[in-house]
């Protein structure tokens, strides 16, 4: 029974090109079951991988150190390598659960890199998945009035056809009123889908951490009780975390309200939501490929598309996506902001219009839409030796040099001097967007890596353009979308 359970949980592709796997093991029933199931499965392979069990001691409860040692003893008795890592430093007073989650995954990634492991597995179960769905669903229901208001605005205030009208220079009606009504209906429904099913797809089985370490949760389809039965059959005990019964936590209250039948019903909804999210991601990716989009020197330009494309219900989402990526935002636009963006874009005029949104300047005219980083709140920072800094949500700078470097936005005077005195030839330079580019400097001079092919003053520095919403954790459900967008921001400069 145990071997059959293990074989049904894993795919051959889970362990492809992998020499070591990090298992996050807290000592609870879920993670201990994961530990032994992975061990049993790997023993059936011709070339078993090395298992490294990692316990994260968040140092939030006095029992945590003892629990980590208990896990270490269990691992020693089964000849499994075990490491305890600790969340050091001052802990936040609010949002402790989400902060602990970020710290936990960061520590796991650090240990994976240290151990030369390309895969992390965690013991999230079907119960975790259903609880997450229920919590998110309840939050959406609480905001139902707001969402209804948004839908009303979508019906009455804009339509995808508005993009066509604006580019044709029309004022008022779109011409084909039946088509306009149908488009308004479609964009309301489909944009609701793009946004709301993203969250309700909940925890993905596979994701990418820091754009380099695979994260797999193989137990998402298994009930917690099944895993406990599996452990009990083998005579193995687990640690019960007392916070799992503390009704001060929303998840505990939701957990205690779920019946077995409700668990099964919600599981079906989650699977459907995940399929929809994957399809929406593919639809958005297909639209991006069909559009004429250029990203260069801090400026994105979406050329006026053919009629069929700018009436596509995903078009506003694409504009919002590139606004976030150009503006350095860490999150995709929520429904309310997306609907407001579309209202602003539906300008029935052929003249140039400009507004700021999501930290981005959006300029709209008969030729298309231009987007670049808004020229404020780009703060200077220091990157010390052997430090990595994410600057402005757009650049990741790693300093392997012998001295600290200063990073900030490109200066107008220095930009003009650079363009005048270097061999760099830029026809009709757009200085507002050029000023959003990263500049590194010290007392000896400055360097704008995207404009200069060779380092002027800095050595041993790596600069990478990132997509903040997908940089820390990227869901497998969004793979089609991320794979299409990534080449637009595929900049890595090594000095």
Predicted regions and their residues:
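Short, solvent-exposed polar/charged micro-motifs at secondary-structure junctions
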Residues: 93-96, 250-252, 416
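Flexible helical/loop "lid" subdomain adjacent to adenine-nucleotide binding pockets
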Residues: 117, 125-177, 183-331
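ATP-dependent adenylation/nucleotidyltransferase module used to activate substrates
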Residues: 1-196, 225, 233, 444
């Amino acid at each position: 029974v145990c071997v059959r359970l293990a074989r049904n949980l894993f795919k051959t592709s889970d362990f492809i090109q992998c020499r070591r796997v990090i298992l996050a093991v807290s000592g609870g029933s879920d993670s201990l079951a994961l530990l032994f199931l992975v061990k049993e499965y790997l023993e059936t392979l011709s070339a078993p991988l090395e298992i490294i069990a990692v316990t994260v001691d968040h140092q939030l409860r006095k029992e945590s150190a003892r629990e980590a040692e208990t896990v270490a003893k269990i691992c020693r008795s089964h000849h499994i390598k075990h490491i305890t890592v600790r969340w050091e430093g001052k802990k936040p007073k609010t949002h402790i659960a989400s902060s602990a989650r970020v710290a936990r995954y960061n520590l796991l990634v650090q240990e994976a890199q240290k151990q030369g492991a390309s895969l992390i597995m965690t013991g999230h179960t079907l119960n975790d998945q259903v609880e997450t769905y229920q919590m998110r669903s309840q939050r959406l229901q609480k905001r139902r009035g707001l969402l209804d208001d948004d839908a009303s605005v979508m019906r009455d205030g804009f339509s995808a056809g508005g993009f066509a009208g604006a580019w044709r220079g029309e004022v008022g009606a779109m011409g084909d009123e039946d088509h306009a009504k149908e488009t308004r209906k479609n964009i309301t429904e489909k944009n609701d889908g793009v946004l709301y099913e993203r969250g309700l797809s909940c925890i993905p089985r596979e994701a990418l951490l820091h754009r380099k370490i695979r994260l797999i949760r193989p137990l998402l389809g298994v009930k917690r009780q099944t895993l406990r039965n599996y452990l009990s059959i083998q005579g193995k005990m687990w640690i019960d975390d007392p916070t799992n019964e503390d009704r001060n936590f929303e998840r505990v209250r939701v957990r205690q309200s779920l019946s077995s039948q409700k668990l099964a019903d919600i599981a079906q909804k989650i699977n459907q939501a995940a399929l929809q999210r994957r399809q929406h991601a593919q639809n958005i990716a297909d639209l991006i490929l069909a559009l004429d989009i250029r990203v260069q020197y801090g400026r994105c330009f979406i050329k006026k598309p053919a009629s069929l494309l700018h009436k596509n219900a995903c078009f506003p989402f694409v504009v919002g996506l590139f606004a976030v990526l150009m503006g350095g935002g860490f999150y995709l636009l929520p429904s309310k902001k997306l609907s407001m963006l579309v209202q602003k874009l539906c300008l029935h005029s052929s003249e140039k219009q400009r507004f700021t949104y999501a930290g981005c300047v959006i300029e709209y005219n008969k030729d298309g839409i231009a987007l670049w980083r808004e020229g404020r709140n780009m703060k200077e920072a220091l990157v010390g030796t052997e430090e990595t800094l994410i600057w402005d949500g757009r650049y990741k700078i790693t300093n392997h040099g012998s001295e600290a470097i200063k990073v900030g936005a490109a200066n107008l005077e220095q930009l003009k001097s650079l363009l005048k005195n270097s061999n760099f030839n830029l026809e009709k330079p757009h200085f507002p967007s050029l000023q959003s580019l990263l500049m590194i400097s010290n007392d000896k001079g400055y360097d704008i890596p995207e404009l200069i092919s060779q380092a002027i003053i800095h050595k041993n520095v790596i600069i990478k353009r990132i997509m903040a919403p997908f940089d820390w954790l990227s869901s497998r459900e969004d793979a089609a979308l991320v794979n299409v967008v990534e080449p637009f921001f595929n900049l890595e400069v090594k000095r």
